[in-house]
Amino acid sequence: MLVDKRIYLASQSPRRRELLKQIGIAYDVLPLRAVSGRMDVLEVAHAGEAAPDFARRMATEKAACGWRAVDLRRLLRFPVLGADTVVELDGDILGKPADRAAAKAMLARLSRSEHRVHTAVAVQHESRVDVRLSSSRVKFGALDDALIARYLETGEYLGKAGAYGIQGRAGAFVEYLEGSYSGVMGLPLYETAALLREFGLAV
């Protein structure tokens, strides 16, 4: 058992850090880029890859990349957690916008639309890897050009799938949400806690 031990978080997301703290998980952030050059995961969907499968694959690859970093840096061998969030609209995957124009286009598409948010969380320890998925339905109200422009000025869209963060000002865009609020934020707490317990952590 790894009771009261730490994990490594293979993510720079402040939201995921906050959520792990919320459920009492001790962690160290694992900066993948600092290990033997760039170790980033290429976040590109395969042709025909469904959004939930893409999220699972990305989370698994991030955890695996983190585990390689543990090996290379000869770190204490705690489990590595990776996660990935994707927004799906009409079968299209909306990832992190490349720039402000891309963010504006995404938000315009999400206006008055129901979309799905898929967040996968994966844990690797030695050769063992497991993954869980949370999928939620989110409906936005009407977003006119002025409202989108004001939101873009906040910069909240940066680094966020679908160009919004539900825990920030975009929370006012949500007409309804069916599923996991923490999953839409970026780390589904129910699935995360269940997965960490399977790896022997006290949650």
UniProtKB/Swiss-Prot annotation:
Belongs to the Maf family. YhdE subfamily. It holds the Pfam family Maf. It comes from Thiobacillus denitrificans (strain ATCC 25259 / T1). PANTHER family: BIFUNCTIONAL DTTP/UTP PYROPHOSPHATASE/METHYLTRANSFERASE PROTEIN-RELATED, BIFUNCTIONAL DTTP_UTP PYROPHOSPHATASE_METHYLTRANSFERASE PROTEIN-RELATED. NCBIfam families: maf (TIGR00172). The active site is at D84. Its cofactor is a divalent metal cation. The record marks R15, T85, Q167 as: Important for substrate specificity. GO terms for cellular component: cytoplasm. It is found in: Cytoplasm. One of its GO terms (molecular function) is UTP diphosphatase activity. Its main location: cytoplasm. Its EC number is 3.6.1.9. It comes from the Bacteria. Coiled coil: none annotated. This is dTTP/UTP pyrophosphatase. One of its GO terms (biological process) is nucleotide metabolic process. It catalyses: dTTP + H2O = dTMP + diphosphate + H(+); UTP + H2O = UMP + diphosphate + H(+). Keywords: Cytoplasm, Hydrolase, Nucleotide metabolism. Nucleoside triphosphate pyrophosphatase that hydrolyzes dTTP and UTP. May have a dual role in cell division arrest and in preventing the incorporation of modified nucleotides into cellular nucleic acids.
